[in-house]
């Protein structure tokens, strides 16, 4: 398996630090609002990577944090008239609601910053003792000039970063790129006792500390959105490696941006959508399928047109599975035919093609294409004359590959509304009585209700559209 490592800017063979085990950290949300569609992409992508690694037999420890103390949370608490703790608790709960809709598994650990304050203070103290941090008026900063490798993740030299960055003027800093590790408490803000006075952690230190606490000083994969490469992940490397003297993460993986209708998403442009907004218009499995239909490092354009294309594609896969299950339920035990023996070999080829795609830098786009090829084979070769064994093998293969991506696994509603059931029966009776115009009218009525009928030898089949 190869993955693209942002640190080396090359595809590298994936070799975990410990055979059979993977330690993985993915930056989680700052919990002050519902997550937006840009947040959803890394959460879906790296959930899929985790699932694939587990499919290949790895024992994955997957850590994703919650930033539950932050300026945005404090501001939201003032707006809503509740405490920062209540804001964080509310949006952590809502985050999991969205994750369930998107098919995202719970992490092995979901640490929160406020549960790790003492560990953060100890980490900063070590940096200060080693000369990498300095305190000014209750704030503590990381001295970027002291860390020789600063800029290696983003591929820039310190002087280039300083020249190109939009830097807030701060007379307390020794150097423009120095970043805060500990913030002195301001009135109306939460704070904790520390050697530098009451205060709270800076953003960057949090992930370094929680990664160390739950995964150790060196991990296999650190991942997140491309926007986190600099400064967040760059700063994580600096403070972690300055403290330990060891490589922080062997592989760094970042997904590309999301544009909305060909424009960068932003609140000022009014094209900012939360996952909760989208869920009112589309099943969130469609969003997951949409994200997986593109390579994770490529930018993607999010629009109604693209979502409707994803919906149609996902519906085709559901129809394949539904038809296969329906056919299977009507077959009796019978051996494989000569043709089916050859087709079973093709089924194995599909599994290998799928693995080859995922092994090539988690190419979910190609993996999805393989699943469509498999669906085509199933649709062309499974019918009422198929052997039970062949149909079972097809379903097992289909479920295995879609299961890795966690798509096409929802149970469709098997209970028809009474009105729909009555209409289908009326149409059946009309056909028996040769009232073909009435039968056609009922078919159209059902179509208007989102129900498509298919007359087969086994009887009338239906599906929702």
UniProtKB/Swiss-Prot annotation:
Cofactor binding mode and count: Binds 1 zinc ion per subunit.
Gene this protein is translated from: cysS
EC number(s) given by UniProt: 6.1.1.16
Gene Ontology BP, a term: cysteinyl-tRNA aminoacylation
Gene3D superfamilies (UniProt xref): Cysteine-tRNA ligase, C-terminal anti-codon recognition domain, HUPs
Cofactors required: Zn(2+)
Organism: Clostridioides difficile (strain 630)
Binding site for Zn(2+): 27, 207, 232, 236
Pfam families per the UniProt record, alphabetical: CysS_C (PF23493), DALR_2 (PF09190), tRNA-synt_1e (PF01406)
UniProt name for this protein: Cysteine--tRNA ligase
